[in-house]
Amino acid sequence: QFGLDVKDCGNLSGPANPWQDAVNGFRHLPEVVQWNQLLHEAMYAELQAGRLPIMLGGDHCLGIGSISAVARHCREKGKKLRVLWFDAHADFNTATLTPSGNIHGMPVACLCGHGPKELIEIGGHSADRPALHPKEIRQIGIRSVDEGEKRLVHDMGIEVFDMRFIDEMGMRHAMELALALVDAN
């Protein structure tokens, strides 16, 4: 009807959540790494095949695998990248900033090179050459950020359109600013 060729690639299968306490500041790191590696490979394969992959469901930490695949693809094709991160939270925590060790509060930090090596390096990225640079991300709808996390987001220079901005200026204006300078490349 819309001229789209939709392909359901099914579900990924990975390790179960072991429900354990944090180890060295990270909860379930081996399992999170496995899931993100699986997702990265699946997303990257679809991008290489010329398709636009859409992932439905999952924990916020899976943004590491999906976005690192898009970042890798864009880098290889010489394309610019802009990530719109719609969330109430900045997800820019690190093991030193949060006592919980929950990696679902860390994906943006990991994508920007601040996190465990195993997650930063998915897709061939590194702390020196992260999947994302702060100028490539816009955070939209943020309303609840830990104090240390807030300082780190500010220090990194990430552009944030928090709920106060949206309430005062409107979502349309926030999106116009977030998408400014986006072109066909």
What are the residue ranges of the model-derived segments?
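Conserved alpha-helical scaffold segments that buttress catalytic/binding sites
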Residues: 1-185
